[in-house]
UniProtKB/Swiss-Prot annotation:
Residues 207-289 bind DNA. The PNT domain acts as a transcriptional activator. The keyword Transcription regulation applies. It comes from Pan paniscus (Pygmy chimpanzee). It holds the Pfam family Ets. Residues 185-195 have a biased composition (Basic and acidic residues). Residues 29-115 form the PNT domain. Its main location: nucleus. Transmembrane segments: none annotated. The gene is EHF. Belongs to the ETS family. This is ETS homologous factor. Residues 183-202 are annotated as: Disordered.
Length: 300
């Protein structure tokens, strides 16, 4: 876990541009900076003013835009606000997020110095290549997409089936906009393009939160009593054991502090993208939006 404190950004002293005062006020001139303290969208304000929740929205956006597995970015390591995030150096990002650290750092610098009020900011900024390698089962127990089961006793913890092996995502990236930073030999080696990599073409089942929820609904025999359909034809569903679902999602993301309150906040991220919708006046009830895929009966 990153401790709150003032990290020093590692910028190249030879580059005059990076030593000029930030010009984000012009780039964000049409955005309401103060809205960040009242639930505003993360891309509408400068990162310096993000709340902890908006930091997580930004991380989720990177996962979705680059089609990365949720395990690529450890959200629990970024339980910090925007001021702390902006003070972190590349080395601190790498320590917190491993190979994904360079991606996070570069995108944050782009936002800080070339701020835009746009949710499509990252699509043209990075070309991400993902490859997988087999890892020994003793290292970690993780989700097995085709055989995930839940403890029907619903005790204090809910165990997943152990997977024999898992794929660890390794990220190598090239940027269309380069920021001059001091490079160590190890960093330079990480930036060398991999010899044989394959771009990830689609997400496996359960990669993102809404898919995770969908897959529980689609497997009622394997996942009894957690979530149920209220109206299958309309995509309306209800959480029956909300904390149990939150524990499962937390285990999938290696976040032991996950609660339903945090999970429901993350679900609100999908409202704007019309993947999930509110169901007013009904507690624990949600609806799949027009952009959600794979939940309808007989849908290919």
């Amino acid at each position: 876990m990153i401790l709150e404190g003032g990290g020093v950004m590692n910028l190249n002293p030879g580059n005059n541009l990076l030593h000029q005062p930030p010009t984000w006020t012009d780039s964000y001139s049409t955005c309401n900076v103060s809205s960040g303290f009242f639930g505003g969208q993360w891309h509408e304000i400068h990162p310096q003013y993000w709340t902890k929740y908006q930091v997580w929205e930004w991380l989720q956006h990177l996962l979705d835009t680059n089609q990365l597995d949720a395990s690529c970015i450890p959200f629990q390591e970024f339980d910090i606000n925007g001021e702390h995030l902006c003070s972190m150096s590349l080395q601190e990002f790498t320590r917190a997020a491993g190979t994904a650290g360079q991606l996070l750092y570069s995108n944050l610098q782009h936002l800080k110095w070339n701020g835009q009020c746009s949710s499509d900011l990252f699509q043209s900024t990075h070309n991400v290549i993902v490859k997988t390698e087999q890892t020994e089962p003793s290292i970690v127990n993780t989700w097995k997409d085709e055989n995930y089961l839940y403890d029907t006793n619903y005790g204090s913890t809910v165990d997943l089936l152990d997977s024999k092996t898992f794929c660890r995502a390794q990220i190598s990236m090239t940027t269309t906009s380069h920021l001059p930073v001091a490079e160590s030999p190890d960093m330079k080696k990480e930036q060398d393009p991999p010899a044989k990599c394959h771009t990830k073409k689609h997400n496996p089942r359960g990669t993102h939160l809404w898919e995770f929820i969908r897959d529980i609904l689609l497997n009622p025999d394997k996942n009894p009593g957690l979530i149920k359909w209220e109206d299958r034809s309309e995509g309306v569903f209800r959480f029956l054991k909300s904390e149990a679902v939150a524990q499962l999602w937390g285990k999938k993301k290696n976040n032991s502090s996950m609660t339903y309150e945090k999970l429901s906040r993350a679900m609100r991220y999908y409202y704007k993208r019309e993947i999930l919708e509110r169901v007013d006046g009904r507690r624990l009830v949600y609806k799949f939006g027009k952009n959600a895929r794979g939940w309808r009966e007989n849908e290919n």
